[in-house]
Amino acid sequence: MNDRQAALDQALKQIEKQFGKGSIMKLGEHSDQNISTISSGSLALDIALGVGGYPRGRIIEVYGPESSGKTTVALHAIAEVQAQGGTAAFIDAEHALDPAYAKNLGVNIDELLLSQPDTGEQALEIAEALVRSGAVDMLVIDSVAALVPRAEIEGEMGDAHVGLQARLMSQALRKLSGAINKSKTIAIFINQIREKVGVMFGNPEITPGGRALKFYSTVRLEVRRAEQLKQGTDVMGNKTKIKVVKNKVAPPFRIAEVDIMYGEGISREGELVDMAAEVDVINKSGSWYSYKEERIGQGRENAKQYLKEHTDIRDEISQRVREEYEIDGANKEPLEETEETLSLLDDE
């Protein structure tokens, strides 16, 4: 062993002695090279994300115009976490969560942890406490724009508070990012959009809360309504495009198209018909859809209805589509507490 290697080994021992075992290691020795994920609750979005769902221990930003389906996307993820036996928390800074709608989407509202804080500082302190407990698998904050700093709440109408919210978010994310990674919590920040005044060229849209969230996010999703879904003259929902604007774990810029039905959320059958037809699991000939030589409906809506009524066939098609896209759940880890996550509070 040469002098350089001996010096390095001595330094590594000193670091581990001072900061604990596992504080530094060779990347090849890291036991968690595969990215562990939790399904988003949408097959199309799982495929667009490239790794089969939201990566655990990472920050996700979901933004878009008003009533585009941002909260719906987050609630589907919560339902998926709860279905796997995990714990989810919802920090409702907007004070606008509809429990009945959440229940329709599959959320177990009896088990969902809910907080409706008065100030941005309170919301982020609650978020930090939940993350550092190591017992929360998913945390949703709705929304960043509603995280109003205490100084603004206590001040007068019309007072200028330049950059307060951006500083608040920057400080909070510096504290949260490490704990989120260690605890394997998925932190979903819902955000709104604003428009810069006087922008003549380029996109005038920006998201509130400064630049910190853009940098700390592993995945950024842009949610926008594409068109209305009608039955006769009645509007039943919206076709929505979810664009993966940023992705640190897979190629970005993929787009998931989903049907968000009023009162029901994302239509599993709608996205399944589209994705299955794309990889020839379902055959589309003219207006007819067929599966294993058997016709399942004339027109997309009839095919959706057939799958809704025949859940065994729907699940079989879903599994085949996941295998075609190679997201059959190989990177799913059980949601359970670990010694590392439970010791987060002791590290402080």
Curated annotation (Swiss-Prot):
Biased composition regions of type Basic and acidic residues, renumbered to the chain: 325-335
UniProt-recorded Gene Ontology molecular function terms: ATP binding; ATP hydrolysis activity; ATP-dependent DNA damage sensor activity; damaged DNA binding; single-stranded DNA binding
GO CC term, one of those recorded: cytosol
Highest taxon above the source species: Bacteria
InterPro entries: AAA+_ATPase (IPR003593), DNA_recomb/repair_RecA (IPR013765), DNA_recomb/repair_RecA_CS (IPR020584), P-loop_NTPase (IPR027417), RecA-like_C (IPR049261), RecA-like_N (IPR049428), RecA_ATP-bd (IPR020588), RecA_C_sf (IPR023400)
Region spans: Disordered: 325-348
Main location per the UniProt record: cytoplasm
Residues annotated for ATP binding in this entry: 64-71
SUPFAM superfamilies: P-loop containing nucleoside triphosphate hydrolases (SSF52540), RecA protein, C-terminal domain (SSF54752)
Acidic residues bias spans: 336-348
Localization per record: Cytoplasm
Keyword terms of this UniProt record: ATP-binding, Cytoplasm, DNA damage, DNA recombination, DNA repair, DNA-binding, Nucleotide-binding, SOS response
GO BP terms: DNA recombination; DNA repair; SOS response
Keyword 4Fe-4S: no
Function: Can catalyze the hydrolysis of ATP in the presence of single-stranded DNA, the ATP-dependent uptake of single-stranded DNA by duplex DNA, and the ATP-dependent hybridization of homologous single-stranded DNAs. It interacts with LexA causing its activation and leading to its autocatalytic cleavage.
Family of this protein: Belongs to the RecA family.
Protein name as annotated: Protein RecA
Organism of this sequence: Listeria welshimeri serovar 6b (strain ATCC 35897 / DSM 20650 / CCUG 15529 / CIP 8149 / NCTC 11857 / SLCC 5334 / V8)
This protein's encoding gene: recA
